[in-house]
């Protein structure tokens, strides 16, 4: 299926002066299953150091167990699927779906408020493997009461801490660095498109939370080999801002440091921002010194909160989101169209029977006219 762009608000690209890109999972796409398996393995290693039973070594990453957009109920050990109104459409405990009666008993008329401490959003690629592992650990805890597992909420917190630690201590990225071909997608067409935008007068910048060394490594690997109209990715990108600390970049006043692209050494920025490579900084200084309004910038990212919601709230930049899960969702909806059409036909056939049942029930209540045999037949 060819990649497509969907909009929920009109976007006139002629008015966009700067196009900003997150790096990880946006400009540079990962081979998701390989990366999530790695993340799953690293988190298990860290949980073992925290005293979790050795049996968790046997757990294998299963990408069918979760998807971004779900919510973890920390206290009950459940994985929840919400609708657009934050009502709960489906729930799983461990590896098993809760049956309808149990689901209704626990969650009837419940609307999820993610600002409360009882729930954890699965809203990034990095939390995807966390959700998979959490469901597996809940299953192990329930099926092995003799093993020393913490309570459900503690398991969720430990998994989150372990994921954060794996990113913070560099253990994940060190593995990626050792085998870039196994984890990173090369996309020559994407590089060609970026050069085309640059040719048409758009200025392109990178805004990433990754550090200088990792950023340079990935850009050298996935961008530089496919450049045709630029000598270096430094010529393609007007600004490369590393270690940006998003979402704080959008609302705090951290200072910019200029980075020497050759060796990563940093110096203070004394003058106005000029094209080049930087660390840190803040959105207010970036837009003010470049003479930009919020809607002059289109920023593309993959993090619902860190890249999209907070950015819209604080800076009014135009935003776009990379949502890989949308592609199979659209494909599945297309495959289901014949079934949906059949259901629609059957629903129309059902309508006159429902109308007749309503009339009979009304007459029974209001006029005492009883035709229980026909009512029973219609209710079947």
Role assignments for model-derived ranges:
Residues 1-380:
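HAD-like aspartate-dependent phosphatase fold
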């Amino acid at each position: 299926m060819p990649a497509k762009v969907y909009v929920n608000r009109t976007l006139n690209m002629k008015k966009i002066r700067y196009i900003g890109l997150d790096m990880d999972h946006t400009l540079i796409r990962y081979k998701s299953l390989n990366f999530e398996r790695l993340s799953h393995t690293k988190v298990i290693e860290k949980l073992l150091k925290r005293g979790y039973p050795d049996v968790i070594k046997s757990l294998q990453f299963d990408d069918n167990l979760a998807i971004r957009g779900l919510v973890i109920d920390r206290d009950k050990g459940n994985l929840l699927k919400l609708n657009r109104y934050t009502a709960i459409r489906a729930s799983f405990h461990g590896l098993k779906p809760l049956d309808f009666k149990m689901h209704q008993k626990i969650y009837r008329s419940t609307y999820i408020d993610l600002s409360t401490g009882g729930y954890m959003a699965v809203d990034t690629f990095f939390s995807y493997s966390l959700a998979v592992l959490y469901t597996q650990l809940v299953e192990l805890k329930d099926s092995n009461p003799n093993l020393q597992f913490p309570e459900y909420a503690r398991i969720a917190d430990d998994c989150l801490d372990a994921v954060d630690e794996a990113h913070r201590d560099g253990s994940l990225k060190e593995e990626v660095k050792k085998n870039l071909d196994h984890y990173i997608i090369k996309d020559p067409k994407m590089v060609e498109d970026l050069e085309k935008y640059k040719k048409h007068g758009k200025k392109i910048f990178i805004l990433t939370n990754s550090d200088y060394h990792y950023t340079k490594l990935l850009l050298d690997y996935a961008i530089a080999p496919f450049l045709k109209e630029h000598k270096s990715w430094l010529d393609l990108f007007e600004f490369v801002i590393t270690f940006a600390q998003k979402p704080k970049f959008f609302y705090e006043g951290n200072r910019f440091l200029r980075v020497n692209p050759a060796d990563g050494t940093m110096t203070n920025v004394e003058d106005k921002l000029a094209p080049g490579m930087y660390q840190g900084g803040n959105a207010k200084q970036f837009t003010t010194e470049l003479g930009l309004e919020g809607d002059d910038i289109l920023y593309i990212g993959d993090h619902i909160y860190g890249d999209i919601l907070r950015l819209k709230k604080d800076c009014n930049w135009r935003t776009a989101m990379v949502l890989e899960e949308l592609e199979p969702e659209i494909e599945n909806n297309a495959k289901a169209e014949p079934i949906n059409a059949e259901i629609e036909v059957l629903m129309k056939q059902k309508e006159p029977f429902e109308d007749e049942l309503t009339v009979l029930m009304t007459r029974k209540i209001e006029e005492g006219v009883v035709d229980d045999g026909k009512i029973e037949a219609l209710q079947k």
